[in-house]
């Protein structure tokens, strides 16, 4: 049984890290309301995640891999009707916190002699159509959920150091062919156009719409795990 530690930063429902957890890895999900990533303490080779009434300490050199999904609220181009103005400085607070954790572990475990990356992998996710690419530059990998077997469009960007997952597009069925007559892409529905009940319907009623919007599609999550075990 795997004992390696996976940090699931701003993990929400834990959907991206789910395949690792099911495979026996020790997944530590750092997300609100349990922990505020911005209050993380990095000191003496240890990482302490701080919550309102609890904390959790991790030895930096024990971390195997990191998945990070900082909130896209302030970055997404879809933010057009929000009551509060877009605040990119506020949005970057969680991004900086995630990167600080990643970099601190890379520094602690540096083994120049063996020319190996301290972390086996790290990846940071956010919508492709947003402002974060203007801060972090060109992403290492981009995908739409339909390219991994999930039936919708939501172009996503991934930055980091990892093996690229193998894409497995939605099968070209007669139904898909019929829809394609008026569309230039495999999928016919953009994520933002889905009815609320159709956004990850498997957890409709359990999580609110905003939480379900942030769920990592299962097809991609499984493919990422297989490429980065």
Model-derived regions: residue spans:
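Conserved active-site and SAM-binding loop architecture
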Residues: 1-229
